[in-house]
Amino acid sequence: MIKSSIKILIIEDNPGDARLIQEMLKEVKDIDFEIIHVLRLDEALKYNLTNNFDVILLDLCLPDSEGIDTFNIMNYNAPDIPIIVLTGLEDEIFAVSAVGKGAQEYLIKGEVDCKSLLKSIRRSINHKVIGNLD
């Protein structure tokens, strides 16, 4: 069951992309989103990830990490938190690889809207909860 409050960590080096995601989530009226945005992977790793976030939105191309290594590092440090990969079209191969390694989903920047973002977040959290019951 989806919570009425969801805490999200956005790891995105482009402030415009991060702001767009936050604006999309503000359109959702029945869920209170608590959003933390960081620009770099090393900033994200400073948080107590396991206890503090319901989902992570992860850009694969960051100033301090790039490609599938970005996902691998985050997944290693937050194995119990669902990760949704955000990617530009040119990074789609990395995104598909990340899903194969455990990312819940990937979203292509520029193609995502409020409805698809919310659906991905809900599905990722529910999938992780069901997976933890096994």
Task: State where each predicted segment sits.
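Short amphipathic alpha-helix used as the core "switch/output" element in two-component signaling
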Residues: E27, K46, I68-D80, S97
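Acidic, metal-coordinating helix/loop segments flanking the phosphotransfer/catalytic sites
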Residues: Q22, H37-V55
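Two-component/phosphorelay signaling modules centered on CheY-like receiver
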Residues: K3, P15-L39
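Receiver (REC) domain switch/output surface
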Residues: S116-V129
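Acidic catalytic/metal-coordinating carboxylates
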Residues: R40, E66-D69
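Active-site residues of response regulator receiver
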Residues: D59, T87
